[in-house]
Structures are given as structure tokens and as C-alpha cells.
UniProtKB/Swiss-Prot annotation:
Spans annotated as Disordered: 1-50
Organism: Haloferax mediterranei (strain ATCC 33500 / DSM 1411 / JCM 8866 / NBRC 14739 / NCIMB 2177 / R-4)
GO process annotations (BP): gas vesicle organization
Keywords: ATP-binding, Cytoplasm, Gas vesicle, Hydrolase, Nucleotide-binding
Cellular compartment(s): Gas vesicle; Cytoplasm
Record protein name field: Gas vesicle ATPase GvpN
Amino acid sequence: MTNSSRERKVRGSQIRTSRREKQDKNARNRTEKELTRLENHQTHRTKNGTSKLDERFIPEEQPFIETEAVTQVETRMRRWLDVGRPVHLIGPTGCGKTALAMHVARERDRPVVWINGDADLTTSDLVGEYAEKERISERDKYVHNVVKSKDIVRDRWVDNPLTLAVREGATLVYNEFSRTKPVANNVLLSVFEEGVLELPGQRGKSRYVDVHPDFRAILTSNSVEYAGVHEPQDALLDRLVGLYLDFYDRETEVEIVRAHVDDFDTEDTEQIVRLMRELRERLDVNVGTRAAIMAAEGLTTVDDLDRSILTDICVDVLASKVAQHSDVHELRDEVEATIKGMEGTLS
């Protein structure tokens, strides 16, 4: 055997070894690419590049009334949102906080993400968690008559609303913010101050998400005297712009009721709003604009209205706000006295 043939044999051996190394390397590369794809899955983009935020649930758009009183609050909200500050709307139940927050959020022409706070909400509910499993199956037939099989099962991270909003530059509407326990909301501190969201439970570089420059937040809360309200920690409140709201003026409430209740006479609308505003002053329970809307809806079903029917409707609307059955009798007495004492009440 010549030296050249030996060299060819050696060269052939090297080629076969190199080919196996290349196959193994390609297999590793495919696996690494697939793992990278999974790491990047939380960007939540569809194939055509549109955001999956478009598919997120947000409350159905409701009629919104623009009066001078409403516009003044809107202007104040936009002032702070324009400079990147989160806005915290605080006020009694039924004064229109949520409707205002959703309207201003939609007007920004950015995606809107909705969170509804409650005592059971956790940090994971806000940011996400490893909530799914994904299996990767690989079949390598590169070498003739040789099949390599490999299955990889790994946890898959699923983003929740806050993370989606931060990534996409959406407007976050966090309704009933103060009903969530303060410890769950700690994650907001770095979002509002450092512009970084930390994902507890994530690993490696994926643990931190830079806040999109278009991200904004609007939070709503009932006043602290309401049951079930947790007082947020001072460090977080220090980073929020607080706007305290009360019930709108009579003219605005009339327009709101008219917008929500079709086929209801204008004069009747004015009278039911007047009645509810009077009850608001006399009763210990909260009588919001929503109560006036509900009462007007009930009145649209009545052909021959009398004082007894009007009393029934008002008591039905407000009875869920009293603590026990015995309080309903006192409520009815107050409603009857108020109706009797008002001139020009619906008749």
C-alpha cells in the first residue's frame, strides 16, 4: 500500500468523523433554535406581526358623555399620562371612575389591557407564570437507515396582563386596584420608577422586561372607607398621581342616564336624577349614578306609574346595599318620605 493510499484512508476516516460531528452539531443547533423560539414566545406576536393584545378581553364600550365637568377631569388625566405618570382615580362606587378610565385609555389609540383587582389576586396573576408544558420532538434521518429520536419537555412561561401591557406599550386599566392586597402590587414599584418589570419565577435574562415607552397606567379605587379596600403602601402611592372624584353635577348625571336608557322621556330623566340625588343626601348607603340608570331602566317597563311603584323600583335598586333584611323597612320608609316630600316627582 502506497503512502498516498494511507493518506486517503486517513482522510476518509477524518471525513466520516467530521460528518458525524456535523450531524451532532446540526442537531444541537436545531434544538437550541427551538429552545430560543420558546424563550421568545412571550413576545406574543402573531405571524402577521399584529399584537395578541387585540384578542384580550376588555369591557364592552359604553356610551360616554362629554360635559364641561367630565372634560375637566379628562384634561387633568391626559396631562399626567402625556408625561408618563400613572394616574390613580379615587372616589365612591358608581361615580364613573371605570367609564372615565376606559374612555381615556381608548382615546390614546394604543392597545388597552384590563385587570380587575380583588383580594385573591397574586403577583403571578399580574405578571405571569410557568403555566403550560410544551414537548419538542426531533427525528433525525440525516444518515441512511439511522433514525435519531429526541423528546424535550419543558415548562412554558405565559404572560399575564401587566407583562403584556409593559411589552406592547399598551394602556393598563387596573380597576379596583385597592382591592388587591399590597404585597401583590409590589411589582409595580420598579415599573413606575425604574422602567423595568421583574418577573418572579422567570429565569436568566428573561426575568427582566424593559417597559415600552408608550406604556401607561390608569388605576381606579374606591375610597378607603369602603369594605374590602386595602390601603396601598406609601412607596407605591408616592409614584402615582391621585385624582379624587365625586359624583358629577346634576346636568351631567342627566346626560349620562339619557345616554344609557333609550325611550325614556327627558323630563322623567331629570326627575329620577333629582330623586336619586336627594336620596344620596338622606341615606347612609351609596347612591351612585348607576343607581339612577337602573331606576330609569325599571321605569321604562311601567305604563301607569304611581307612588307605590316608584317606591318599589327605588327600593329594589338600593336594597342590595343594606346589611340585612330589617334594614329594608327603614330604607322603604326613607324612600317613601323623600318621594312624598318632592314636588314634581314622576307621576
